[in-house]
Amino acid sequence: METVRIATRKSPLALWQSEHVADRLRQAHPGLHVELVPMSTRGDEVLDRSLAAIGGKGLFLKELELAMLRGEADCAVHSLKDVPMELDPPFALPAMLTRHDPADGFVSNLYASLDALPIGARVGTSSLRRQAQLRALRPDLELLDLRGNVNTRLAKLDNGGYDAIVLAVAGLERLGLGERIVARLQPPQWLPAPAQGAVAVECDGGNARLMALFAPLDDAATRACVEAERAMNRALHGSCHVPVAAIAQWQGDDLHLQGLVGSASDGRAVRAEAVGPANDPEGLGQRVAKLLLDDGAGELLNV
């Protein structure tokens, strides 16, 4: 019996996503044996500093990629928003699964919305993108760092450390915690991270057998959207060190891409949007990036 080993982080959300991919693989290939290889990454272990301070979201990938290179796993499953814009050889993304809700969720035990927060309320997030948009919308708030997995963050809220926190809707709903969302933060006022809500499979792009195994899991509509968002981010040289947000949505047969570059320190933000053919998401992403740069985003990117 053929076996596929999936490298995954150990967090509940990462395990859920990897098991979801495993289930889809078993459905697509009856008789295939799929097993998870849970691993801890530096991004999971260092929780007292922001991701930007310790090397960025790529920390979530490196150990999993090393496991593949050592032959301990055949593939890895990631939240696509954590995947760098450029993969190191020989890696590729053979499958981007159907995207979940890409929105951010406002979570609070006391207040029904972002607007309802009192002046000086404490909001937890370590995401520079979320901080930038919070400062733009509510410059009076006190923004506090918040790291850890979803359950850890919720526990910190419940223990009184924050008046509200912001988490991805997809992560909460995948873990059966959707009832904790009191409001969705959505376009056009609020934009998610590029590729937020999408799960991707990574493997050796030169391994034709693996590439073919994962091909049935790929969702073309999702891939078009997230490739436009990631192309914009790539053209801006964005990373978790810079507040960049993007969302592409289908508009008939075309894609509508909205992008934002912000400042986590003072709430300044530059926005741009464009519509383009779905068969050229790269071009659309580059066009919106140019619009952002033409409108002054470069100044924020170089802060």
Curated annotation (Swiss-Prot):
The modification S-(dipyrrolylmethanemethyl)cysteine is found at C240. It catalyses: 4 porphobilinogen + H2O = hydroxymethylbilane + 4 NH4(+). One of its GO terms (cellular component) is cytoplasm. One of its GO terms (molecular function) is hydroxymethylbilane synthase activity. Binds 1 dipyrromethane group covalently. Its EC number is 2.5.1.61. Gene3D superfamilies: Periplasmic binding protein-like II (3.40.190.10), Porphobilinogen deaminase, C-terminal domain (3.30.160.40). Pathway: Porphyrin-containing compound metabolism; protoporphyrin-IX biosynthesis; coproporphyrinogen-III from 5-aminolevulinate: step 2/4. It is an enzyme of class 2 (transferase). It comes from the Bacteria. Its cofactor is dipyrromethane. One of its GO terms (biological process) is protoporphyrinogen IX biosynthetic process. Keywords: Porphyrin biosynthesis, Transferase. Tetrapolymerization of the monopyrrole PBG into the hydroxymethylbilane pre-uroporphyrinogen in several discrete steps. The porphobilinogen subunits are added to the dipyrromethane group. HAMAP family: Porphobil_deam. Belongs to the HMBS family. Monomer. This is Porphobilinogen deaminase. It comes from Stenotrophomonas maltophilia (strain K279a).
